[in-house]
Each structure stands twice: as structure tokens, then as C-alpha cells.
Amino acid sequence: MSRNLYPNFIQFIQDSMQELTDRGQEVELAGVLYHIGENDMSWGPFRRGAAERMQTLVNASRESLDLPELKCFVSQQPPTDDKQVNEIDVTSMIAEVAAADPHLIHVKTFDLPPQEKKLVLDTAGVVALGEELAKSWLKES
């Protein structure tokens, strides 16, 4: 995975689970949440590869955590409406990958509150995103 974020992501999960276990808690990782955001929705090369990167992250996470059926909830914000990238149907590509994986839930968060900036979610947008992920989690649990 790029920029060394992936090892830190996995280590954080493992450390958190171990910390809870050390405190006497029974721990089960029931799923992970991942957001496909601004860069993957707006820049052509990222938009073209978003679905493949998502699948790579999901597969690698399951392998690293030794949980082949780990549920992954992947939220997607609306694709940027720009003539330079509109021919790249990123939503369909992501939906196709999700449809082939019974443990991957594609959460289309296309009704977020209006944002001041074109791509960046503000506080209200992040809260709404969290609410949509929570609804999806509850529906699937």
C-alpha cells in the first residue's frame, strides 16, 4: 500500500484489539470502515484506479488480520462533476467490485449536506457521512 499508511492502519487495529484483550475484554473485529473521498472522486488517474485500490485494501486487510470474511463498509462521496473526468464512471466500477464480494458493503453517500468547498467535506459533511456508515452497519449487523 502507498505512503506506508497501510502498515500503520493494520498495526492500529491489532494494537487496539490487544489493549482491550489485556484489559480482560473479549474482542471480535466485526468489520472495518473505509471512505473513498476527494482524490479518488476528482483526479482522473485516481478515479480510474479507485475500485482496484479499494479491492486491494480490502483483500490485504483481510489477509493481514487473518479474517477472510471480514466485513468492509466502504463509503463513497459523490464523484466530482467535471467534464475532464465525467467519462470515468467510478461509481459503477466500485459497485461492480462490491457486488462480487458478499462481505463488502458499498455505501453511496450522495446526499451529504451542501459543502462550502467543491471537494472537501466540512464538519456537517463528516457527521452525515458517519451517520450513513452507522445506518449501513446497523442494517448489516
Q: What residue spans do the PLM features occupy?
A:
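Cell-envelope and extracellular/periplasmic
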Residues: 1-141
